[in-house]
Regions:
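Hydrophobic anchor at the beta1->P-loop junction of P-loop NTPases
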Residues: 33
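P-loop (Walker A) phosphate-binding loop of NTP-binding proteins
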Residues: 36
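ATP-binding Walker
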Residues: 39
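Walker A/P-loop
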Residues: 42
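Conserved substrate/cofactor phosphate-moiety recognition/catalytic segment
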Residues: 50-108
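ATP-dependent NMP and nucleoside kinases share a basic, alpha-helical "lid"
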Residues: 117-171
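Small-molecule kinase domains that catalyze NTP-dependent phosphoryl transfer to phosphate-bearing small molecules
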Residues: 160, 165-211, 215-219
Length: 219
């Protein structure tokens, strides 16, 4: 057999063997967390990681934004044609709010987060997805994307006054963005579990999520 013929056959053999090994691995377990900025998602995600015996990877939109050059985004109030920036508005009560504006490159990065998540799930990695889906429609897109996997969808709520206080104290958030997200984020969608990061401790919420995930996996 010539070397040229042998190499493709060898590659096919390797890929076939890998597929057999992958099929023997446990199916990926996924926890999808959706909540407004400053609601405590990252703290919760890290606590969940530490609580499981099996490793879970922590993915999120903030991590994807860290891939981007700083100059492409504008978090100070100006317009960023390609990346992320803020769009000023007023809510129904007249309060000033700021919506996230995503330019074409930012939209590609949002889609990249989804593609990375699917790729890792297809390789049987357990995932905790830490998201800021700004509408119920975006959550429904995730549901469609991950429909072939065991996913626990968790909505995170926190009283508006608490979000706004955290927003002010952090100093790295646009004042008014928490209010905008609070008003629209959980509309027109549903979750397997809703938790309040203000009313319950992180440990209590971790226990609730793990219990709900176990019940879902048994169905």
């Amino acid at each position: 057999m010539s070397v040229k013929k042998f190499i493709p056959s060898f590659v096919v053999c390797i890929l076939f063997c890998y597929s057999l090994v992958a099929n023997e691995l446990p199916v990926a377990k996924i926890i999808y967390l959706n909540g407004p900025s400053s609601c405590g998602k990252s703290t919760l995600a890290k606590a969940l990681q530490e609580s499981f015996e099996d490793p879970f990877l922590h993915l999120g939109i903030d991590k994807v934004i860290d891939f981007m050059p700083d100059k492409i985004n504008n978090w100070e109030g100006g317009y960023a044609p390609l990346g992320f920036s803020w769009k000023a508005d007023n809510d129904a009560t007249g309060h000033p709010i700021f919506h996230v504006h995503a330019g074409p490159f930012a939209k590609r990065m949002i889609e990249t987060l989804k593609m990375i998540s699917v790729l890792l799930a297809s390789q049987n990695f357990n995932l905790i997805i830490d998201d800021v889906a700004l509408s119920g429609a975006e959550v429904e897109e995730w549901k469609q994307l991950l429909k072939n996997y065991d996913v626990l969808y968790v909505g995170i709520v926190t009283p508006l006054e608490v979000l706004e206080e955290r927003e002010r104290s952090r100093g790295d958030r646009r004042i008014g963005s928490a209010r905008a997200q609070y008003q629209t984020m959980h509309k027109n969608t549903s979750y397997d579990l809703t938790i309040d990061t203000h009313a319950q401790t992180t440990a209590e919420n971790v226990a609730k999520i793990k219990e709900a995930l176990l019940k879902k996996l048994k169905k």
